[in-house]
């Protein structure tokens, strides 16, 4: 049986590993964390621990700040679409887990996209169509986020089609994931499914305050792992980086299917 000491040590190790994956390929912290934490704690407790590490690592990924303005000018409509799609999805369907068939269907789509990406085929979105396609992609990403809690589809595919440099792609993913996290958090808070509710489900009398404290403590291993992952990423060739990103999406897709 897991006692509290072993659970804390295991959670620290999980967030360190998840942060490393995040630093290397720009995504995967929620997936790795939830998959491994579920081995020794309830999903509600795992989700509560994940809140701040997910948000803060996405904010860190958005640096450097100087590059945000041109990125926002290019992706502003997409961010608006993400917010509207997420809030609308929560209002219409009731939030994450409300449509059980959505997760495996999304997983299958993600597997197909990852296999296509690993084949070496690529496409680019023409500049005149990037604004409206970005808004449409944002709406769809937001709607999918609302019912599955997954931010990457089809946002990552669209961002890859823009022909961004590797640093710009990492920053763009950080921006989109931050927008999605905040929008989903706002929607769940509105529906009464936020961190305080999760803490109450876990039987924690201190509710929101204790949940935030536990989540804040997991920031240390997550950020340390992310820094190490970023150092490893600098040693990767662009082609190897792209393959690792596609493999990460493939693993995420398989995880969602089951």
Residues covered by each model-derived region:
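Selective hydrophobic functional segments
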Residues: 48-99, 182-238
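Structural signature of hydrophobic alpha-helical transmembrane segments
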Residues: 7-8, 13, 37-55, 100-110, ...
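Hydrophobic residues within alpha-helical transmembrane segments
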Residues: 13, 17, 52-59, 76, ...
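Cytoplasmic-side transmembrane-helix entry/capping segments in multi-pass membrane proteins
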Residues: 70-82, 103-107, 128-138, 168-175, ...
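Transmembrane helix exit motif
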Residues: 58-69, 90, 96, 105-130, ...
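Hydrophobic alpha-helical transmembrane segments in multi-pass integral membrane proteins
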Residues: 46, 88-93, 143-150, 184-187, ...
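Selected transmembrane alpha-helices and immediately adjacent juxtamembrane segments
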Residues: 1-40, 123-180
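A helix-boundary/kink motif common to multi-pass secondary transporters
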Residues: 42, 97-98, 165, 237-241
